[in-house]
Amino acid sequence: AFIMVPAWVRDARADLKEVIDKNIRTTSPMQMPFVTHWLNQMEQDKVLNYISHAGFTNSATDKLKIIFVPCYLDGHDGILNKPYYDLLIGMDATVYPSYYEPWGYTPLESIAFGIPTITTDLAGFGLWAKKHVTGNNISEGVAVVNRDDFNYFEVADAITSSILALAGKDKKETAEIRKRSFCLAAKAEWSKFIVYYEEAFRIALEHASKRNN
């Protein structure tokens, strides 16, 4: 599982870069085996603290490996050295559990690359997607989870269920879900949405004209 959320980065890890550059093979976890870059005030980072609290170790026997990439992915981060979109297309799914987004382009970008996504109805995209999918059903390409101020654990459970449902699909079913992702993304292309911007500007100009007169 990749957590690609920017934090207060200090620098790229020299020890990790050496392992990658020299193609060193080992089953022993490194010091702080979750994070690709050193952070300022690492002891206060909420992501690292929760990973530790949850008991993850990234050992060879762990079924789930976590990689926290805390930098902006511009292709020059010193470790991955690939832009965000080149990494996105390598994912099986994405999760953007928005607490508030006027629109939220990241889940739309995900399905535009055929990567099924999980979002919430507190994102504008999530509200739009709910008009085209039945809800929290990742098989449709987008799962929209209901979220409010009081249902944190229910949201976590719903996201977990969606991930497990996707993980249980076979190759053919996964390919169909990717196709549905592409199809839904096509409905949100700029050529479809430009009419709403034109209407908004028309209304704004009308009101401005009335004020001037």
Where are these regions (language model features)?
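Nucleotide-activated donor-binding/catalytic signature segment of Leloir-type glycosyltransferases, i.e.
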Residues: 3-86, 142-144
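Short, flexible loop/turn elements at secondary-structure junctions
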Residues: 5-8, 70-73, 95, 99-101, ...
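Short beta-strand "acidic-cap" motif of Rossmann-like dinucleotide-binding folds
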Residues: 1-3, 119
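Acidic donor-binding helix in nucleotide-sugar-dependent glycosyltransferases
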Residues: 86-87, 109
